Amino acid sequence: LVGAISMMLDGNHRRAELGYWIGRPFWGRGYATEAARAMLDFGFGSMGLNRIFAHHMRDNPASGRVLANIGMTREGVLSQHVLKWDQFRDVVLYGLTRERFLASKETVHPGQR
């Protein structure tokens, strides 16, 4: 197993939370970025979502780079939001709206939607 990726849907608000993990032997190969981009395409395209967001542990900057690389914007920090290994940890929140996603696609591929 290389890893997993999912979106937890909130249909009432047309949004989803993106989550993923990649097994250590596969870190640094671009798998998370590639899979996350595919999820954005699916979420904003086929599913008609308006917003997709994600968070990562503050002490995992590699995951933050994945979120930035797929076009998400850092929106803030939730202090001591998660209890992991008997310690409360901060998480960094990222998000992307449909409008910004489509605008970025238009910049990269003018005239194609």
Model-identified regions with their sequence ranges:
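Acyl-donor (CoA/ACP) binding surface of acyl/acetyltransferases
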Residues: 1-113
